Amino acid sequence: MQTNLSQLIKVARGETEADLVLLNARVINVFNAEIEQANVAVFDGKIAGVGDYRHGKEVIDLKGAYLLPGLINGHTHVESSMLDIAQYARAVVSHGTLALITDLHEISNVCGKEGIDYVLDASADLPLSIFLQVPSCVPATHLETAGAEINSQDVADLLRLPNVTGLGEMMNFPGVLFGVPSVLDKIIAAAGKVLDGHAPGLSGKDLNAYISAGIHSDHECIHLAEAKEKLARGMYIMIREGSSEKNLAELLPLVTDQTYKRCLFVVDDRSCADLKSDGDIDAVVRKAIRLGLDPVRAIQLASINTAEYFHLQGHGAIAPGYLANMIVCQNLEQLDIDMVFHKGKLVAEKGQALFKPQSRIPKSLLNSIHIRPFDTKDLILKTIQPQIPVIEVIPGQIVTRRLDLKIPAENGVIKANTELDLLKIVVMERHHQSGNMGHGLIRGFGLKKGAIASSVAHDSHNVVAVGTNDADLYTAIKELERINGGIALAVDGQVTASVSLPVAGLLSTKPLEEVVTELEEINNQVAKLGCKLSAPFATLSFMALPVIPELRLTDLGLVDVKTFKLIPQET
């Protein structure tokens, strides 16, 4: 160790040759927001110096290309890609993401700590630094049934692991506000660490109370005024642009010379199709630049700001002593990535990963769909109420609206009405064979025929299905049982397409390209049935999440998120 440090110092002083020298670079300096003409010397995976360096075991002339720090995704759920961690790395490293922060609450809601162990173990040899925010909400709330639990003692144990930065998004904001002991115990266990928030729409004294508990950030802002209030009260604002959650255009005016250090870019949830076609955090940077943000400022929000918020020493900049995680591109505004270096090693070029990761998936994670036997009669929606609460989807957002509509019933039975775009939605418990099943109506999917189903249903990941009739709902759900989890489409009693996600019912075992092709096929079929949503299965996956306003459906029933209570259903 001392020998390497001594050699690093000698390389920095120009007394001995570097492992790698990058000549004639236009270096993006994230500390002073300037672009510097310089050479960069690398030794033992670190940057030795920026300046006049010419002697190295390997020398690459960049001929005036831009050299950027590796990008950092400050908040993402890798499971939303539907890829196992090895294939996920292939997808994002080629787009310049060399570090990320995730809380893995998707897979841990199904498999507990075993799911976390799988991701951390499988990522150990990848050219991608994964930092963990310990899941704070497994289960997310008492209003649904999860497959596992991570309690305050588990949180304390996980916080001692390497590469753990703090406590993941505290979604149970009512639990914070009402002082629920089990919630507060987790916050206390993470004292001194970074505590991420999740507080959609919270303001005034409730916001003060939430922040006073020690929570530092929020990524759920959808309106500029909301983001301004939270920033003014001391929060870091994670500006999100994912596959279903698109908040960048609305929130970008928040970034000024006075506020930019309190802002960072995140994707939260991004599909493998979007990762392949558009990219990861680089896509957010490109869009921010198109919307008028200065390119260097945009890079700061995807590198040094994130590193400093999470206290990631050695990440986020091209400077002496920092990790040699670097990106080469010709056009800063287009961010067309030519080369990606991880610790000084070329790991991707022209959009192609140069490494071949090996998947290491425990067999115990491959059997997670446990549904009590059911038939179409169990899917019937009955009511004697004059008005029915209906979930309304908002395109491009994961928040929903509550509609209370008069729906005609036949002998107390409510059926879907495709002319009014009123479809049936069902959530079925799939971890313990309890038989729990929630029923409701939803508007916004636009299906004219058939049904879609998914075992990806944030955050407890029970089975969620939307359809025009009970027979197709039944067929789609039974297909999920057959393939050990995934997504499915059924029309006229037949399965017309499905994508198997056997790892915890969330992730595929197939290569990136195959998964993307399968997803494109099923999405195209859904579109032909009348659905106008750009990402129907991504949207479907959030309909059972009872911590995002206004109305949700879990296996226990309809949830009014404003009151954080189940809505009684009189039948």
Swiss-Prot record:
Pfam families cross-referenced by the UniProt entry = Adenine_deam_C, Amidohydro_1
Q: List the cysteine pairs that form cystine.
A: none
Task: Look up the EC number in the record and give it.
Answer: 3.5.4.2
Which Gene3D superfamilies does the annotation name?
Metal-dependent hydrolases (3.20.20.140), Urease, subunit C, domain 1 (2.30.40.10)
Annotated catalysed reactions: adenine + H2O + H(+) = hypoxanthine + NH4(+)
GO MF annotation: an example: adenine deaminase activity
* UniProt protein name: Adenine deaminase
Q: Which family does the record claim for this protein? A: Belongs to the metallo-dependent hydrolases superfamily. Adenine deaminase family.
Name the species this protein comes from: Dehalococcoides mccartyi (strain CBDB1)
Q: Which CDD domains match?
A: AdeC
Top-rank lineage group of the source organism: Bacteria
In terms of InterPro entries, this protein maps to: Adenine_deam, Adenine_deam_C, Amidohydro-rel, Metal-dep_hydrolase_composite, Metal_Hydrolase
Keywords (alphabetical) are: Hydrolase, Manganese
Q: Which GO terms describe its biological process?
A: adenine catabolic process
Cofactor(s) this protein requires: Mn(2+)
